[in-house]
């Protein structure tokens, strides 16, 4: 898994290719197409690889009497139930068409999380390149089967899951991909709270997913700031997903735990800087180290004047900077050899000074 083989446009864990960054607009458009368009422009400006929305119909997603999660109650007090909140956050099919066209025209990949089979079929009709499975649907076996039957790349978030639940999800989709599963599936570690505390992140679980299932992994981040997603890249994440908003003060469930456009841009730059810092993994001096190496390493140097033909003893030598001459590791080959010319004390010995 350390090769540079692409996984449907996404790098495998441990490769030297760039991380796939998803700017998660989610429902931060508040049901407003113009605000959704602004999010597409901002995602492109940030340097992210994709902008992602959410595709659902409240009528087929949630019972009308289900209460909201605690963070939803705190962040979106204007609605009394999940249904009421989500109904106001729907995008129409026409909205999706327009957002997809805008993203394509800007050169940023359009993505959306479809929450049911009909939404998945609609997204495929829009030409999406991959499907994103949200954490809440990971135990929805009929839905997983429907998604996998499309034979598109899958990104599965694993928030609120234990390993056995992830294993069942993988076993559900695997028959549709066979031995090519690792070319199509990326698992995202995730903590499903908005915002997630550092204590709850448990980022090492991302590595556990990679080790347990031998699949590419990434991280869907709900913490505040850029530390955790940047660290995840250093730990091998090939996908990073991060919520962003045009304005954190807007009403709605996810704005407070989202980045503003400038922060999103900073995150993308931080990830790209992290990739640069990680490098290729090959242990060798950098081009900028080579001049310094010559100055701070030692060479075999004459301690006293010697004439041509003199046999060199250990007492004739001292090891001094710079390291432009014969290396100290060759001293056993130099002691007992003879000079090919007259040399003065302080001369940095070169091989041309030694008789063949």
From Swiss-Prot:
Residues 299-356 form the AFP-like domain. Its EC number is 2.5.1.101. It is an enzyme of class 2 (transferase). Coiled coil: none annotated. It comes from the Bacteria. One of its GO terms (biological process) is glycosylation. It catalyses: 2,4-diacetamido-2,4,6-trideoxy-alpha-D-mannopyranose + phosphoenolpyruvate + H2O = N,N-diacetyllegionaminate + phosphate. Disulfide bonds: none annotated. GO terms for molecular function: lyase activity; N-acylneuraminate-9-phosphate synthase activity; transferase activity, transferring alkyl or aryl (other than methyl) groups. CDD domains: SAF_NeuB_like (cd11615). This is N,N'-diacetyllegionaminic acid synthase.
